[in-house]
Amino acid sequence: MQIVLASQSPSRRRILNSAGVEPLIHPADVDEDALLHSLNGSAPEEIVRQLALAKAQVVAPSYPGDVVIGGDSMLLIDATLQGKPHTREATIERWKQQRGNKATLITGHAIIFGDEVIVESSSTNIHFAEASDVDIERYADSGEPLECAGAFTLEALGGWFIDSIEGDPSSVIGLSLPVVRRALYRLGFNASDFWNM
């Protein structure tokens, strides 16, 4: 038995790796834009939970004897939910909006084992630094934040521009170890059952 990560996110993989788990990577093929459109008007936590669930549900049938984890993260700032910026220009625009402000990074989790499905979200408050225009542009030029929820990373270059967080650091990076641990316990497993030691 193993953990299957229904994601191509290098950050989610690194979280599990640093916690002793070498997951099987099986990215989910989900039309996120269509799903987001269908969830229009839903609460932010529900949106990320449903995105995570859709990813896990697509992958789970291929791994009936394994634990499948789907995840999705978005940044809630000024009552607007933001995903990945994808472009340099969008990254710069977002950073000029969020610098010096507080936002909430919401990560949805879906953990599936057989017929059992656990869906939960984790929210962490982020206090963004007053980053300079030059640093914002250079950060965007690095390419690092283009495919990251909220246009930032906590564990790499983006860490320079985060003053503090309130909540679970692993959730900000993309996968809450406390949420996954609780789900494993509910499924009758120990976290250590999946350690590669």
Curated annotation (Swiss-Prot):
Localization (cell): Cytoplasm
Catalytic machinery residues: 72 (proton acceptor)
SUPFAM superfamilies: ITPase-like (SSF52972)
Keywords on record: Cytoplasm, Hydrolase, Nucleotide metabolism
CDD domains registered for this protein in UniProt: Maf
GO cellular component: cytoplasm
Cofactor(s) this protein requires: a divalent metal cation
GO biological-process terms attached to the record: nucleotide metabolic process
Class of the enzyme per the UniProt entry, highest EC level: hydrolase
GO terms of molecular function: nucleoside triphosphate diphosphatase activity
Domain of life of the organism encoding this protein: Bacteria
Catalyzed chemical reaction(s): a ribonucleoside 5'-triphosphate + H2O = a ribonucleoside 5'-phosphate + diphosphate + H(+); a 2'-deoxyribonucleoside 5'-triphosphate + H2O = a 2'-deoxyribonucleoside 5'-phosphate + diphosphate + H(+)
Enzyme Commission number(s) of this protein: 3.6.1.9
PANTHER family: BIFUNCTIONAL DTTP/UTP PYROPHOSPHATASE/METHYLTRANSFERASE PROTEIN-RELATED, BIFUNCTIONAL DTTP_UTP PYROPHOSPHATASE_METHYLTRANSFERASE PROTEIN-RELATED
The family this protein is said to belong to: Belongs to the Maf family.
Function: Nucleoside triphosphate pyrophosphatase. May have a dual role in cell division arrest and in preventing the incorporation of modified nucleotides into cellular nucleic acids.
Stated name of the protein: Nucleoside triphosphate pyrophosphatase
Taxonomic lineage from the root: Bacteria, Bacillati, Actinomycetota, Actinomycetes, Mycobacteriales
